[in-house]
Amino acid sequence: MSSVVKKPLGGNTDTGDHHNQKTEWPELVGKSVEEAKKVILQDKSEAQIVVLPVGTIVTMEYRIDRVRLFVDSLDKIAQVPRVG
């Protein structure tokens, strides 16, 4: 049997025991991938960071351990990184 964790509506996107952890990093837009990874892992050490070109089609399942980094052609963060 499998279970699905759905993203709740509203500002708090966390559904687990990590309610005090940061869930988005707007300050990282324009930074390098390495800078972004370093900051995110300081805030959320268990994060699985996935780097993708901006515009990539992704699955819709919500995972509290995943942060996607959408990068431009210069490998700079193009969208706000978020848990999910």
Curated annotation (Swiss-Prot):
Detail the relationship between temperature and activity: Optimum temperature is 25 degrees Celsius when incubation is carried out at pH 7.0-9.0.
In its UniProt entry, what is this protein called? Answer: Subtilisin-chymotrypsin inhibitor WSCI
State the disulfide connectivity.
none
Residues covered by region (Disordered): 1-28
**Pfam families, from UniProt?**
potato_inhibit (PF00280)
Q: What role does this protein play?
A: Inhibits B.lichenoformis subtilisin, B.subtilis subtilisin, bovine pancreatic alpha-chymotrypsin and porcine alpha-chymotrypsin with Ki of 3.92 nM, 5.70 nM, 7.24 nM and 9.35 nM respectively. B.lichenoformis subtilisin is inhibited with a molar ratio of 1:0.87. Also inhibits chymotrypsin-like activities from the digestive tracts of the insect larvae T.molitor, P.interpunctella and H.armigera. Does not inhibit bovine pancreatic trypsin, porcine pancreatic elastase, or human leukocyte elastase.
Could you name the Gene Ontology cellular component terms for this entry?
extracellular region
Per the UniProt entry, the signal peptide is 1-12
Q: Which family does it belong to?
A: Belongs to the protease inhibitor I13 (potato type I serine protease inhibitor) family.
Localization, per the record, is: Secreted
Q: Could you give the subunit structure recorded for this chain?
A: Monomer.
- MF (Gene Ontology): serine-type endopeptidase inhibitor activity
Q: Identify the residue position(s) of the site Reactive bond.
A: M60, E61
Provide a GO biological process annotation.
response to wounding
